């Protein structure tokens, strides 16, 4: 009795091999079950904080590397799969996962794969522009928050500032 003083009731007979104050959750017969999911590691128990530095469940909640774990990094959502993360949609994670797979937050329009920094590479490698026809020139009338380009017809790749006009 009293071996696992952090589990209630403290007077119960529990096994605490790692001396962290929490009893083993699957003890031998005749011993009261505790809340320690890994009684071989003294830093693993229900009062511990999850950390990205380990590959196991630190806080006994059955999840490994929870959102917001210690030493996590912001990963930004890339819902349009253009390789650029949304500027305000982030989760602090241990690893990239699902749509939260970008470490940058440069995407000015995460609803269009043709709108991101460098989309109009013939005009700017860094400005956020929309290039719907993928001709390298940005739309002259883009949505709010997106820099205007020089393409007067962004639905036709044959009409842009880089194409020579022909007389018929």
Roles of regions detected by a PLM:
Residues 1-168:
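Membrane-associated feature with strongest affinity for ZDHHC
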